[in-house]
Amino acid sequence: METIAFRMVLNPGMREEYERRHAQIWPELVDALHNAGVRDYRIFFDPDSHHLFAMLTRHNHHTMNELPQLDVMRKWWDYMADIMQTAADHTPLQQPLEPVFHLNSLS
């Protein structure tokens, strides 16, 4: 298992809508993420910067790189494009975050 984190940016004033949409996440999208090896996916919000900080655990043999080819993933990104920063194809703009500390890794 591997943990990764990344940052995205939510448009100002869209926190409640972002939370509402995720509270009603499509079951077929949940299945696609699970089938790709994604586990324990969490997203945090910084109200001062409008940044979203995502963290997830994935299997070592994950297939996350195939998610952008799935219709359900593309439709979800289209659905979310009006409330967050995205590329022209509606892929969310993401900045990978580097780990700098992990308490469990201490001996």
Curated annotation (Swiss-Prot):
- Main enzyme class: isomerase
Q: What is this protein called?
A: L-rhamnose mutarotase
List GO molecular-function terms, semicolon-separated: L-rhamnose mutarotase activity
> Which GO biological process annotations does it have?
rhamnose catabolic process
Q: Which PANTHER family match?
A: L-RHAMNOSE MUTAROTASE
Could you tell me which pathway this protein works in? Carbohydrate metabolism; L-rhamnose metabolism
Assigned protein family: Belongs to the rhamnose mutarotase family.
